[in-house]
Each structure stands twice: as structure tokens, then as C-alpha cells.
Amino acid sequence: GEVRARVKIDVEACVREAVLSLGYNDEAVGLDGRTMRVINEIIPQSPDINQGTALELNKDKEIGAGDQGIMYGFACNETPELLPLPYVLSSRMMRTFETCGDPIFAPDGKGQVSVEYNTEVCGPRRLAKVLMSNAVDYRQINGLSREAIKARAKEIAFGCLADWVDKDTVFLFNPTGEWQAVNSCSAADSGVTGRKLVVQFYGGYPGAQLGGGAVVNKSPEKVDCSAAFGARYVAKNIVAAGIAEKCAVQLSYAIGIARPFSIYINTFSTCGSATDERLAQVVEELFDLRPQGLIERFDLLNGDIYRRIPKTLFMDDYPWEKTDMADKLM
């Protein structure tokens, strides 16, 4: 990666701290943050880019977008969080596994749910399937059979999803049969940062598109980061205002230029009070979607945010989850 800074950062220490905070403290669970090898290949940012995007070089709040690209935001009224139900349920399940404290389940895992929808009312009807893949620390199983481990995982998953589970909900756990913790994480899968954007961006919900770049490895002048939050903020406030039942917001930017290259809104024929084109005009008038405006509104120079967003971009008390613009949109 590239970065330009006036401070010296102990990159290796930061990396080790982050890895250990995720529970990777033993090679038996795939990785040990204390003994792993850290290779630092961060280099200075190109001066050609830096001259148009650096905060300290642009005091007039017109810093340009750190790159060109298209970012999307989405909201719908399926849940109190104004997010698609499958995204909310799968996120809830993953958080529960992370915090349950059961030593059998190692840090490496991923979940997926399938929700059946009622096409007549365009709303969720039932939770059809739940899939949980999680590395198992076989040092901790104390003779438990594979079926007993699955039963324990099912109890955790169905417990946190109880309001949607029914007698016909199917549960799958480690469908290949076995996933040993020693063969998890970087010991088995090199991967790259931001490899599975759909996990963070609305869970593949129809109509909720993905932008071209990851969020979690970007500084805020990179609109892959800040504008993704801005687009979600706009969409959520439109739905919170009761203007539409669901809303997708597309923002595009040109590198070095502060204001959006384009603004596009799609309310999927659920807005009866205005056209999508008129909504886009109102959004451009009411929302400051320049990188500096987004950085200030969302407090994106606060380093604590970047410790949290790798786990979830939405649902928490993030500034872009506020609906404080809903009244102004009405």
C-alpha cells in the first residue's frame, strides 16, 4: 500500500496488536500474533495523487477525491436497522459466535443465511437455511463427536436467531465434514484484504449493489471509504423519512475533484411523493458529499472507527447510521 504521513508509525506493532485482538494467539488456531512474520511493504504515496488529496495541503475544504470510482449505499424498511433482514441475521449470528466464549470454536469462521420472501408483499416470510462454517479447536473438544459439535453450534446459532427460526429451518455446519483450527486462517488461506465485499455490503440483497473497492484498508480521502458511508447515510435517511420503502444511492467521483461526478437514486417504485431524479437533486442540495465534508460529518479522522469497521460497517452507533437528516428531507 501507499501512505504519506508526518508521523512515524510502528506498523509491525499495530499489526500484531490487531491480530491478537481477534483471538489469533496460538498457531494451533491458525496464527499467533506474537510470533508471526510481518512484512512491511508500505511506501510513500505518489506526489501526483497527494497534491490533490492531502488534507494538510488543501485548507479550503475542497480536497479532491482520492481516486475515481463508483460507490453505493442502500437502505430498506425490513428491519429497525433499515437493513436487509439476511444481512442483519447473519451479522447477529457472527457476533454471537465471536462473543460466546466457547473454546471449541476458533476465531476463523463465516456465516450465511437464506431467507424466503413473500413476493406479494415484497417482505421476508421465514428463515429457510442457516450455514455456519467455523474452525474447530480439537484440543478443546474433550471427546465430543462431530454431531455433538454441530449440535452445540446449532444451539448458539438458533438461539440468537430464535425470532425467525421455525421447525423447518435447515442448519448446516462445516458441510465438508471437518475444519480443524490448525488448518485455518493464514495457515490455509492467504487471501487479500477486502476479498469478499458482499459480506460487508448488504449481503448480496437484490438491488443493493457493490462499489468497486474495499473500505477497510483505505484512508478517508479515498472515496471507496468515505463515500460508501455517505451513500449509506443518504439512503438510510430517505427511508427513515418515509419517502421510500427501499433506496439505493450511487455516487461517483473523479480523482482530484471534490464534488461527486454523478448522483443517482433508485427507490424501486416505492416513492410516491417525488421522482428519483428530483430526490437526487434534493440530496445534492442538502448533503455535503465532498471528501472533507464526509470526513468531518462522520469523524473519519478518529482512529477508533478503523478498529471496528473490519467487523461491521453498519448496525452500530456509527455516525453514518444516524437519521438526523430525515426531517429535512420530508
What do the predicted segments below correspond to?
Residues 246-330:
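Internal helix-turn-beta structural module
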